[in-house]
């Protein structure tokens, strides 16, 4: 394959390394080292292979132990190559060869080994087919592939693939890994020629966290291996765990050269967090085994529950002697199917029949714990670190029997990555097949000059041009590896030998499919097995009922703190997953697991505290006892008021009604009626309309009553006080004047109410006396309501003052006394109402009821005190409702005589009459004097004064008692 790398510096460096290696081959000290051991099969196209056949060595690149998985993966590549070469439908006429090397599970050594692939790709330098058998000059290796590497299968460890991919990309050599899962390998800006038949660890990390969440484990420890596999994998896992509220109690890293003390220290740290019973392992298989060994040495009283990545997977040998510690472990393994034909292939292999694999003899000895004596089947590695003769305890082993065969009885089990190795080989094969179809089937024969040019430029073409049977064409040899990777390799899609779909995404990653395994004791047996308990493909599907736990009959917990009960929140202490549970306030709901939030006014949390609901809005209901009582009083008051109005209307022109001052009497009755009706406005559901009625009704209703009473008391006071001082007729005491004065006083209250509505527009509001109550009320502040009644209080106060001033008027003038009694009682009611009203602010029902009853009582006092005497006469003594009534009061007679003589009266009132006047006291017209003593003309000061009494008279042509006529006041009669 023609390389297009023109970077002279890189070429010089590689040439130096290559020549140094040629020199090394001559060095006796390096003869027969592991470097010279490889699997090389000739072919038209050569694929390289990198597998961890041996473990790491101490003081040497490779250790003595042969890994079962490394040998199986190597054999899987050879098996797949055999199938492709024997398949007439794939690359017909073209043979694929191999050049497979051992990485010894070490990234630096793998990089050194990969230089063999690079040197073979240089135009005039191909030493990969040479060897120095006895320290002499290099000779062509017997099984040399005699050609450059077209692509590489491997490595297994992500750390190995990272090193190798950085080198191979410089020479445009594509690489497909069957096992490297580090996330960073998906970065096409760094690894633009790397692909893999397995998914990146990002998906595996998600699968592991899905398992933790499935068991409700929120507090776990993690252990990861040093290197790209463990470090990148655990980084992705920690990120996913943090996003999903899984906390890490202990996070430990296993160094590359860790000894038993390191592993014992890790277990000791895990024991310090006893609540974190779940332990996630993102380690290589050998590290996982040593962790289990350390756990066994610690003799744990409470076992850990292991959750492991595919580094552990479903390997049986990893757990030999540690089954009791590993029991119940849950592992993740790439979803793979058993290739039955590969098992048959492996089971028919023996050291005698598998001479092409130089490490198979070591694998055989390790599997059967025996020693091969036939040197013909053993690799010449007498000086290597893994030499059989150097193995400890070799003398104790028996000689290998010729009848030995691989089988399940001796512990053979198909390695989990076998399918992905085969898929990687087939991916190259199908991509090369498509390239061959595109470049070779339609091209014409090359000219002689072109063939000579390709022979001089391409080592690979020099090789295939000598093979007359090869169907490979020069264009395949000349095709750039990077273009091959992008145009062919990433675009392959096929169904593999296990029946699974194989394809790559644009990052070169395989499909993410995992099996979830549980390590369980076999039924009716002392053995153990991995049992599939679930799968992961874009999500977890797990049957928790089939999980077996270590020394547990029920699913264990792994949490720093137990979950909080419904309606409680977490208060963190120390680690983010450690908390104490605290209750929310009664009016709060659980906003999130750490926060309570106030539901807000008018809302209350449900019993589970997860959300809030709207509280029922409360207001006075018509059927409430608090409404029925004031309504009954109001209805009774309205009925009485209506009766009085009807009686007054029926007796409109009778002396009693006329003497009462009809205009002010009706005005006062209307005010009383308004006050009673206010009860219904106060009890009605608050709306803008009802709130307007409340404001107008209460203030204006009271102002109508007390404006009329003030006008009456003022008129009485003026008349009786002026009568003793002046004979001039008083102004503004006529009915019309009294109505105007009353209306003016009422208008002031109306104006105050209008201003109040402008300053504080009427409306409704919600009142919250406590968190569980929502009361709908009119938007009236208590103080503004009190201020709006200030004017009425002034009217009441003035009325009361006038009532006190007129308390000593003639005995028979009882209406003034009734007005006084009304005002005294009203003051008492209001003085009692104010503290009760403001003291019951938290109980809207009591407050509203108090207000309604207070208003009704004020109206009832006025109604009873002022109108009951008149109603009594109208109903029970209609015969008294006449002009001629007896005046038998001694006080009245003395007062009348004193007034007639111009002397002061016994009541404190004096009167000096002008010519043509007569004296009136007690609201009655008449005297015991003779007609010659009292003129028939009334005094102008007393005109209409009798309107305040229960005896009718008229001035200026209206009804008057005849001179000398005996008249008795009605109030006096009522009082008898």
From Swiss-Prot:
The chain crosses the membrane at residues 627-649, 664-684, 696-714, 739-759, 783-804, 818-840, 851-876. The keyword Thylakoid does not apply. Residues 927-946 have a biased composition (Polar residues). InterPro entries: ANF_lig-bd_rcpt (IPR001828), GPCR_3 (IPR000337), GPCR_3_9-Cys_sf (IPR038550), GPCR_3_C (IPR017978), GPCR_3_CS (IPR017979), GPCR_3_mtglu_rcpt (IPR000162), mGluR (IPR050726), Peripla_BP_I (IPR028082). GO terms for biological process: G protein-coupled glutamate receptor signaling pathway; learning; long-term memory; male courtship behavior; neuromuscular junction development; regulation of synaptic transmission, glutamatergic; short-term memory; terminal button organization. Its main location: membrane. Residues 650-663, 715-738, 805-817, 877-976 are cytoplasmic. This is Metabotropic glutamate receptor. The gene is mGluR.
């Amino acid at each position: 394959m023609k390389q297009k790398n023109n970077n002279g510096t890189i070429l010089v460096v590689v040439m130096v390394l290559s020549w140094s290696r040629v020199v090394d081959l001559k060095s006796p000290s390096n003869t027969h080292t592991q470097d010279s051991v490889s699997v090389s099969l000739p072919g038209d196209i050569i694929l390289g292979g990198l597998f961890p056949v041996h473990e790491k060595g101490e003081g040497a690149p490779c250790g003595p132990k042969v890994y079962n998985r490394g040998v199986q993966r190597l054999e899987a590549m050879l098996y797949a190559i055999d199938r492709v070469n024997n398949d007439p439908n794939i690359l017909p006429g073209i043979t694929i060869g191999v050049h497979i090397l051992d990485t010894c599970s070490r990234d630096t050594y793998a990089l050194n080994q990969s230089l063999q692939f690079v040197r073979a790709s240089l135009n005039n330098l191909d030493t990969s087919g040479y060897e120095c058998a006895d320290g002499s000059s290099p000779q062509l290796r017997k099984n040399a592939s005699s050609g450059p590497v077209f692509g590489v299968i491997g490595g297994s460890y992500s750390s190995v693939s990272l090193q190798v991919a950085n080198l191979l990309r410089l020479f445009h050599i594509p690489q497909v890994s069957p096992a490297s899962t580090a996330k960073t390998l998906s970065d096409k800006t760094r690894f633009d020629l790397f692909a893999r038949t397995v998914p990146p660890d990002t998906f595996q990390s998600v699968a592991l966290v899905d398992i933790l969440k499935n068991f409700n484990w929120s507090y776990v420890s993690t252990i990861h291996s040093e290197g790209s596999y463990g470090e990148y994998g655990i980084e992705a896992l920690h990120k996913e765990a943090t996003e999903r509220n899984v906390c890490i109690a202990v996070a430990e890293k296993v160094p590359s050269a860790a000894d038993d003390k390191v592993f014992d220290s890790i277990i000791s740290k895990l024991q310090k967090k006893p609540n974190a019973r779940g332990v996630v392992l993102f380690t290589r298989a050998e590290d996982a085994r040593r962790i289990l060994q350390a756990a066994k040495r610690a003799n744990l009283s409470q076992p850990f529950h292991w959750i492991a990545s595919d580094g552990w997977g479903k390997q049986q040998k990893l757990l030999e002697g540690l089954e009791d510690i590993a029991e119940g472990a849950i592992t993740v393994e790439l979803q793979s199917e058993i290739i039955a034909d590969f098992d048959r292939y492996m089971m028919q292999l023996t050291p005698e029949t598998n001479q092409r694999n130089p490490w198979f003899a070591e694998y055989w000895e390790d599997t059967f714990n025996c020693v091969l004596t036939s040197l013909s089947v053993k690799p010449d590695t007498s000086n290597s670190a893994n030499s059989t003769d150097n193995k400890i305890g070799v003398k104790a082993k028996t000689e290998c029997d010729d009848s030995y065969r691989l089988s399940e009885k001796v512990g053979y089990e198909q390695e989990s990555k076998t399918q992905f190795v085969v898929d990687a080989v087939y991916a190259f094969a199908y991509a090369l097949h498509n390239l061959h179809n595109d470049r070779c089937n339609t091209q014409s024969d090359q000219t002689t000059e072109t063939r000579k040019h390709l022979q001089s430029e391409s080592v690979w073409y020099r090789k295939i041009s000598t093979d007359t049977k090869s169907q490979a064409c020069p264009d395949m040899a000349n095709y750039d590896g990077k273009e091959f990777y992008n145009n062919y390799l990433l675009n392959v899609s096929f169904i593999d030998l296990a029946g699974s779909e194989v394809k790559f995404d644009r990052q070169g990653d395989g499909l993410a499919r995992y099996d979830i395994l549980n390590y369980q004791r076999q039924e009716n047996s002392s053995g153990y097995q991995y049992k599939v308990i679930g799968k992961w493909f874009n999500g977890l599907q797990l049957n928790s009922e089939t999980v077996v736990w270590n020394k547990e009959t029920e699913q264990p917990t792994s949490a720093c703190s137990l979950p909080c009960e419904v309606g409680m929140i977490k208060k963190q202490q120390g680690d983010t997953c450690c908390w104490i549970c605290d209750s929310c306030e009664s009016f709060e709901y659980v906003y999130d697991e750490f926060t309570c939030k106030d539901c807000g006014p008018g809302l209350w949390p449900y019993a589970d505290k997860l959300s809030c609901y709207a509280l029922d809005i409360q207001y006075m209901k018509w059927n409430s006892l608090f409404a029925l009582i004031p309504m009954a009083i109001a209805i009774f008051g309205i009925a009485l008021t209506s009766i009085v109005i009807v009686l007054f209307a029926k007796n409109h022109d009778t002396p009693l009604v006329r003497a009462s001052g009809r205009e002010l009497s009706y005005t006062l009755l209307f005010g009383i009626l308004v006050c009673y009706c206010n009860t219904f406005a106060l009890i009605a559901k608050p709306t803008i309309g009802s709130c307007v009625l409340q404001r107008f009704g209460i203030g204006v209703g009271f102002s109508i009553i007390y404006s009329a009473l003030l006008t009456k008391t003022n008129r009485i006071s003026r008349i009786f006080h002026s009568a003793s001082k002046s004979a001039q007729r008083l102004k503004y005491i006529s009915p019309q004047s009294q109505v105007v004065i009353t209306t003016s006083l009422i208008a002031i209250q109306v104006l105050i109410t209008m201003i109040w509505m402008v300053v504080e527009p009427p409306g409704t509001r919600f009142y919250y006396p406590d968190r569980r109550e929502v009361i709908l009320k009119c938007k009236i502040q208590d103080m503004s309501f009190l201020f709006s009644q200030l004017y009425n209080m002034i009217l009441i106060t003035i009325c009361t003052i006038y009532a006190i001033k007129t308390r000593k008027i003639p005995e028979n003038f009882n209406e003034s006394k009734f007005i006084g009694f009304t005002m005294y009682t009203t003051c008492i009611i209001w003085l009692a109402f104010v503290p009760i009203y403001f003291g019951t602010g938290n109980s809207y029902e009591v407050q509203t009821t108090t207000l309604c009853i207070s208003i009704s009582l004020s109206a009832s006092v006025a109604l009873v005190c002022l109108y009951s005497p008149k109603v009594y006469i109208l109903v029970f003594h209609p015969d008294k409702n006449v002009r001629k009534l007896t005046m038998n009061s001694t006080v009245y007679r003395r007062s009348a005589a004193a007034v007639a003589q111009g002397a002061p009266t016994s009541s404190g009132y004096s009167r000096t009459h002008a010519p043509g006047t007569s004296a009136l006291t007690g609201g009655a017209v008449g005297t015991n004097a003779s007609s010659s003593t009292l003129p028939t003309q009334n005094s102008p000061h007393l005109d209409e004064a009798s309107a305040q009494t229960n005896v009718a008279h008229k001035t200026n042509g209206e009804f008057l008692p005849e001179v000398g006529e005996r008249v008795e006041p009605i109030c006096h009669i009522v009082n008898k």
